[in-house]
Amino acid sequence: MSDSQTLVVKLGTSVLTGGSRRLNRAHIVELVRQCAQLHAAGHRIVIVTSGAIAAGREHLGYPELPATIASKQLLAAVGQSRLIQLWEQLFSIYGIHVGQMLLTRADMEDRERFLNARDTLRALLDNNIVPVINENDAVATAEIKVGDNDNLSALAAILAGADKLLLLTDQKGLYTADPRRNPQAELIKDVYGIDDALRAIAGDSVSGLGTGGMSTKLQAADVACRAGIDTIIAAGSKPGVIGDVMEGISVGTLFHAQATPLENRKRWIFGAPPAGEITVDEGATAAILERGSSLLPKGIKSVTGNFSRGEVIRICNLEGRDIAHGVSRYNSDALRRIAGHHSQEIDAILGYEYGPVAVHRDDMITR
């Protein structure tokens, strides 16, 4: 076994249930055994788990509930405790303690809360405790949800300072086409950079019963790889898959980490779910992508959403393509007022100014 590494393992609903309506406990037992074996060898393991709603539905005897957010949150509230009890029970067989962390998008958007979550997660790891992470589905609304556990796992990998992120699913990896519809589809074993062609392939693929399909796994891989974290998509049903990944054995699709990873602050900017969105003109797009310039108010065409100064926002071109994420120097209302104006007009329009740029290049990361 190699020197100690930190591995984040994301377990989707399709892996935990085997495609059924209930948790597949026999399979979860095997996954815990693999993790415990690595833990005993000195590796640090983080679990990102789905399955709270499935656990709640099973515990309540599959009640007939309306298809509403309130119903899902009811099931999550019941299932969350059942789920953590299951992880606790199974890891205790090996003398391993677990610690639960429930996160929402707000924990990632706010830099101080992000750092606090990081410190908590690393304290658990430093004390040989296995963190079990899930989104706080019992209280999270659409506005504060990360949205899927694929992207949550990438953020967890950044928080943990992980070496590898393993996304376990019901497929062997990323294929050249959806293997369920195209028998000629081939497994892509290595990816050295994510481009629009790969995104198009992932957009046509599906992955099990959960919130995230292959497209969200690609998003997660992009975030993690740019933070210097190797990411693997593999089948959760493959025997010994977790150990194989830690040994460097070829499994599924390996997304190779960026050779020069982002600095810590830019990892947060890149990984934080955007609080809003602005659309910029062709001149601003070229300045950002080709010259690495800051974004000036003059180049802003429209502002979407309500956000505060200091929050991370998405920057899109006129075609709607996501070209960058950055920390806004002004809130959404102020940006709407100064959009299309020259920087020297800011003070006259607002009665104050926080500098001539809307998003500074030091607070921006291109996609």
UniProtKB/Swiss-Prot annotation:
Binding-site residues, substrate: S50, D137, N149
Protein name: Glutamate 5-kinase
Reaction(s) catalysed by this chain's protein: L-glutamate + ATP = L-glutamyl 5-phosphate + ADP
PROSITE patterns (alphabetical): GLUTAMATE_5_KINASE, PUA
SUPFAM superfamilies registered for this protein in UniProt: Carbamate kinase-like (SSF53633), PUA domain-like (SSF88697)
Pathway(s) annotated for this protein in UniProt: Amino-acid biosynthesis; L-proline biosynthesis; L-glutamate 5-semialdehyde from L-glutamate: step 1/2
Domain of life: Bacteria
Domain PUA span(s) in chain numbering: 275-353
Pfam family, one: PUA
Function noted in UniProt: Catalyzes the transfer of a phosphate group to glutamate to form L-glutamate 5-phosphate.
Keywords, ordered alphabetically: Amino-acid biosynthesis, ATP-binding, Cytoplasm, Kinase, Nucleotide-binding, Proline biosynthesis, Transferase
Keyword Transferase included in the entry's annotation: yes
Residues where ATP binds: K10, T169, D170, T211, G212, G213, M214, S215, T216, K217
Protein's UniProt keywords contain Kinase: yes
